[in-house]
């Protein structure tokens, strides 16, 4: 016995999935950005290795802290809204980090980025379970 599911058109479903996957990919970029920019960050903010590591770690602190709340919030408000919010906040965090006049603002930007890209993976999987046919879930995951 098979259960029929009403899913949106494939192009729309994969487009929305791509949005979440794009945010997840952006998260990987932001994880390694301080390693690539270590010289520039050290010179611009006068950082030693410890301070640079702390600046980089702010991303991971907020990323980890948002993992469980992300699932709960996605169940309450829906993954699409949460994903859009994550994209907006990560964009604001990236702009703040790029234009930061001091270490405080750079750290706040990193913290916002980490917390907001944390929604990417959870929301993408949740959208895939609802929007894609069951046979295609393993491809989307």
Regions found by a protein language model. Name each.
Residues 15-49, 70:
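Extracytoplasmic
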Residues 23-28, 60, 94, 102-114:
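Helical-face signature of the major facilitator-like transporter fold
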Residues 28, 32, 98, 114-122:
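Small-residue-rich segments within alpha-helical transmembrane domains of MFS-like 12-TM solute carriers
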Residues 32, 60-68, 118:
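Residue-level signature of mid-helix packing/kink "hotspots" within the transmembrane helices
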Residues 44-45, 76, 127-131:
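Helix-to-coil boundary motifs at intracellular loop junctions of multi-pass secondary transporters
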Residues 48-56:
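Juxtamembrane helix-start elements in MFS-like secondary transporters
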Residues 65-104:
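Conserved MFS/SLC helix-loop-helix module at the cytosolic interface between two early adjacent transmembrane helices
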Residues 109-141:
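Cytoplasmic helix-loop-helix junction between adjacent transmembrane helices
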